[in-house]
Amino acid sequence: MDLNKYVQEVSLQDFGKEFRHVAIWNRRLRSTGGRFFPRDGHLDFNPKHLEEQGLEVFRKIVRHELCHYHLYFEKKGYRHGDRDFKELLAAVDGLRYAPQLEQATKPSLIYCCQSCGQVYQRKRRIDLKKYRCGKCRGKLTLKE
């Protein structure tokens, strides 16, 4: 899909205004569907949203970012809390929040205190020589 062309089409069809800057894919985005950069006017989009949620949801994400874009260049309130933004977003049926993506979670590590049995769940390994139980100061062990 040619992202720049698609964003231009959505802008003309849903806003009746031209998109004159650049739209690019950004695979590093994690919790957001897209970003608007007021400094140079370009838009970033997360390709994972298109892959996982489909074109209908992705179009609503594009509308959301175009609301920021058009309001900024019209010198109106373009931030999430501004009335102008909320009204335009509702008028074009854009998404307020991007849907949650499937996250490849790291396997949890479970540490257990040998003295009191307190259980700690962590994503990262800890140095068992350095750390002790926060409850009783007992020695921790990694559960398999």
UniProtKB/Swiss-Prot annotation:
Q: How is the cofactor bound?
A: Binds 1 zinc ion.
* One function term, GO molecular function aspect: zinc ion binding
Asked whether the UniProt record includes ATP-binding among its keywords, one would answer no
Report the subcellular localization.
Cytoplasm
Ranges where the SprT-like domain occurs: 4-143
**What keywords are assigned to this protein?**
Cytoplasm, Metal-binding, Zinc
Instruction: Tell me which residues this entry annotates as catalytic.
Output: E65
What Pfam families does this protein's entry cite? SprT-like (PF10263), Zn_ribbon_SprT (PF17283)
Gene Ontology CC annotation, any one: cytoplasm
Q: Which cofactor does it need?
A: Zn(2+)
What residues bind Zn(2+), as annotated? H64, H68
Query: What does the entry give for GO biological process?
Result: response to stress
Entry similarity comment: Belongs to the SprT family.
> What is the designated name of this protein?
Protein SprT-like
